[in-house]
Design a protein with these regions (language model features):
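Aromatic/acidic polysaccharide-binding cleft in carbohydrate-active enzymes
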Residues: 296-400
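Substrate-binding cleft and catalytic face of glycoside hydrolase catalytic domains
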Residues: 50-264
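Carbohydrate-binding surface patches
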Residues: 394-433, 437-444, 469-472
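Short, acidic/polar
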Residues: 35-47, 147, 237-248, 329-337
Length: 476
């Protein structure tokens, strides 16, 4: 390797002689699951290849149109009926989906209690309206847990551990809506902003009351499950403070808090974890788990790019290396997944809904997006290795490495997220010189492609096909 090429190379290191922790598959989960219609064995196999530990049920009602699944208004469709009477519930379709997820895909279930997102505009709401009777909804939630964990209403004894109260109550006009809308009204921008702030405060106060009501009800009957939420849109400190304060005053402890993160900055996600831990500890909930249960790459155009109607903006959002599901997105995922393993996070769920389209893993022709190959690549690491070994990245390059349970296999994942270096030098301790290695490359031109890379003098050199994002797995 010449001096000139060294100037265009990042240098990272791995020490297989130094163990620093254990791999945690629970940090590699998703919302992807089976569907009632159009879910072939091929689709099941594709989901399995991505290797998710658990499946979160949020938005499954959207992916299963015309079916009564998961959402509480589907499970208990006539709200004025008696919630303690098992004959008033409709569980069959949800039973079928969860059974397929558990048995066919092999995932654990993370059950979101509440409703799927409702993009019906600022004034028209149906399922996402704030419930009139919090106690009634809490009783419906209890009936749901009882059905799946205790066999009630011709149910099951599946021992589903995690139950989440609602989703994104802080999201305007989609999830926790006032009857006359969440946007402010008034004759001037100032009046509208003031009224909007009033509505937001009211919505937050109502949700804190609802959250505590449901938490108390579920923990009183089911002390063995973990209950929490509420899957905020992001690590929103003011909202979490209000929620944790309400729990403390009610003397009920959430088992976990959850939030979402859509960004193109990996460190922003890691920073949100540190903030979550700090907040829970501050309010005395030191055993409260931290869960990010929606996360996804969001390109430089943000949500404006995703929802734009401008053909030029849409083309940049959905096509090329920097697109929503392109190689930058995939290497962002691999960077984040690697960092999760040594963070204070307890669980993480990559957001996917439907199999094709914006939030899928393939296009309408069945061609896999780059993110599919990246998620499959991480699965090969987290499910093959047991012990995390010491490693050090550099700049845009992130490294995670480890050994199998019996110590015979060693693996390394090297991810360069939007870097400009043409080569990556990997220095390795703990592997005898000259030992054969197997390398898989993932970049804008290659999808999970085996390449030959010699290992000599305690190092190997990974060559990128071009500047930008790329990832490699190395196996000894």
């Amino acid at each position: 390797m010449s001096f000139a090429s060294l100037l265009l190379a990042a240098t990272v290191s791995v020490n297989f002689n130094s163990n620093i922790g254990k791999f945690r598959p629970e940090l590699h989960s998703s919302s992807y699951g089976p569907t009632i219609a159009g879910c072939t064995q091929k689709t099941i196999d594709e989901i399995k290849e991505m290797g998710f530990k658990s499946a979160r049920t949020h938005d499954w009602a959207l992916a299963n149109s015309n079916q009564r699944v998961c959402d509480y208004h589907h499970i208990f469709p006539i709200i004025h009926l008696d919630a303690t009477n098992p004959s008033n519930y409709v569980f069959a379709a949800t039973d079928y989906l969860l059974k397929r997820a558990r048995e066919d895909v092999g995932t654990d279930i993370f059950f979101r209690l509440g409703v799927s997102i409702e993009h019906s505009g600022p004034k028209v709401h149906f399922n996402s309206l704030i419930p009139d009777d919090f106690d009634k909804v809490a009783e419906i939630f209890a009936g749901t847990v009882r059905h799946y964990n205790h066999g009630w209403a011709n149910g099951h004894k599946w021992g589903i551990k995690y139950w989440e109260i609602w989703n994104e109550p802080d999201n305007d006009n989609t999830m926790w809506c006032l009857k006359d809308g969440d946007l402010g009204v008034g004759s001037t921008p100032e009046e509208k902003a003031k009224d909007k702030a009033r509505r937001d405060k009211l919505r937050m106060e109502l949700f804190c009351k609802f959250y505590v009501t449901c938490l108390k009800r579920l923990k009183s009957e089911f002390p063995d499950i973990k209950v929490g939420g509420p899957a905020l849109c992001f690590m929103r400190e003011d909202y979490f403070r209000a929620l944790l304060k309400a729990c403390k005053e009610a003397q009920v402890a959430p088992d976990f808090i959850s939030w979402h993160q859509y960004t193109n900055h990996p460190q922003a996600i890691i920073n949100s974890i540190e903030k979550g831990r700090s907040l829970c500890d501050e309010y005395g909930f030191k055993d409260c788990e931290l869960i990010i249960n929606e996360w996804h790459y969001l390109g430089p155009r943000g949500w404006g790019g995703v929802w734009s109607s401008d053909p030029e903006i849409l083309a940049k959002t959905w096509e090329g290396p920097g697109s929503h599901n392109g190689i930058d997105s995939s290497c962002f995922n691999l960077t984040v997944l690697s960092k999760f393993q040594t963070s204070k996070l307890d669980q993480a769920f990559y957001y996917g809904c439907f199999y094709t389209g914006a939030w899928g893993y393939k296009n309408s022709f069945g061609n896999k997006y780059k993110i599919y190959h990246g998620l499959k690549m991480f699965s090969s690491i987290v499910h093959s290795l047991s012990t995390i070994c010491e490693s050090k990245g550099e700049g845009t390059v992130t490294v995670i490495a480890g050994k199998s349970k019996n110590g015979r296999s060693r693996g390394i994942l090297v991810t360069d997220y939007m870097g400009t270096d043409k080569e990556i030098v990997v220095k390795i301790d703990g592997v005898e010189d000259g030992r054969q290695c197997w390398v898989i490359a993932h970049d804008n031109e290659r999808d999970f492609e085996p390449i030959y890379v010699p290992f000599n003098d305690g190092k190997l050199v990974l060559k990128k096909t071009t500047e930008g994002s790329a990832a490699f797995t190395i196996w000894f």
